Amino acid sequence: MKKSRIWLAGAAALAIAAPAIADTCAFPSERAALELNALQSHLAVVAIRCQQDATYASFVRRHQADLTNAGRTAQTHFRRAHGGAGVARYNNYSTELINAHDQEAARFEGFLCRDNAALYQQAVAAPNSAELIRMANSRNILMTYEPAVCTSATPTRAARPARRQR
């Protein structure tokens, strides 16, 4: 399948899901997990485009527990925010995120490998997930879903439709 079709499919999925996603907030741990997911997605795309499979594998091995935890926490956010549709929403988000990173990489193809070499070394050497998240923020890693952080004034779950009266 052509990359443009994959991107269009991801964009369509986001357009369908965006209105429902927009009103949902994320707890700080969920927001951090989404940021770590974005960094991992970015590094995966760079690994493929720059033939850095071994470096990516080192990153994943070194931070496996943090990456697994971030994935679970992100899934928990989508289930909490969207109930029964949460798993499908998480899958759509994951697909859209990787497609967006691939499109971004295509735009910067000539500089992608050079510009991300240091990021890879820093990511592999990072001591913990907090440092990885700081790196993602300082490098302005693309995020396709950025819910507001929950406060006492924001809803923590999407509103349920009213039950029909019998």
Regions found by a protein language model. Give the residues of each.
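Bacterial N-terminal signal peptides that target proteins for export
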Residues: 1-8
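Intrinsically disordered, low-complexity acidic/Q/S/K-rich activation/interaction tracts characteristic
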Residues: 11-12
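N-terminal signal peptide c-region/cleavage motif recognized by signal peptidases
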Residues: 17-19
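Short N-proximal segments of mature Sec-exported proteins
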Residues: 28-84, 94-100
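Compact alpha-helical subdomains of small soluble proteins
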Residues: 66-165
